[in-house]
């Protein structure tokens, strides 16, 4: 039984939350782009859709868990075969977010933002996260680091007034 479009969009979105891939890259990702190496499973894109640069992204178990079963599909088969347009996917994500009680604007790009912010918040360094995202300039990645710093400031400020000041 083929998964519904809603399920395919959800799987691809969550996969991107753990890989940082753009919609244009995940929608064209084939089984042939996924390689087993001595270091683990990696995605190897010869040319990213947006930047036309080569990108290699290691896959962690969380990312792998969101991938559909390959079965006997050829290497040329797209991994997330049901994705049509980013607009259609964004409409599905908006509906899924609403059903889940999420009151924020969610688009496919949100997964990329989620990956970057979480990788930095977990202690990943700016340079490595920048390379994983395929950014040409570390300044582009700095936007996500600023979000993490804002969150740290909010957390520290929660402690104000907790104890009597001198």
Over which residues does each language-model region extend?
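Conserved catalytic core of the tyrosine transesterase superfamily
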Residues: 1-14, 35, 49-50, 84-85, ...
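C-terminal catalytic core of Y-nucleophile DNA break-rejoin enzymes
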Residues: 48-68, 74-95, 107
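C-terminal secondary-structure termini that scaffold catalytic or DNA-interacting sites
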Residues: 73, 160-166
């Amino acid at each position: 039984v083929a998964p519904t479009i809603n399920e395919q969009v959800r799987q691809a979105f969550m996969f991107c939350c753990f890989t940082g891939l753009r919609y244009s890259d995940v929608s064209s990702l084939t089984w042939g782009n996924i390689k087993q190496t001595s270091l683990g499973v990696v995605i190897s894109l010869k040319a990213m859709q947006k930047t036309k640069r080569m990108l290699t992204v290691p896959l962690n178990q969380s990312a792998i868990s969101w991938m559909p079963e390959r079965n006997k599909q050829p290497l040329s088969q797209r991994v997330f075969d049901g994705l049509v347009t980013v607009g259609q996917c964004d409409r599905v994500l908006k509906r899924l977010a609403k059903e889940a009680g999420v009151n924020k604007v969610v688009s496919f790009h949100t997964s990329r933002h989620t990956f970057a912010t979480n990788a930095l918040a977990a202690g990943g360094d700016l340079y490595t996260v920048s390379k994983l995202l395929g950014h040409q300039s570390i300044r582009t990645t700095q936007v996500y680091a600023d979000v993490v710093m804002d969150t740290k400031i909010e957390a520290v400020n929660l402690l104000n007034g907790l104890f009597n000041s001198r």
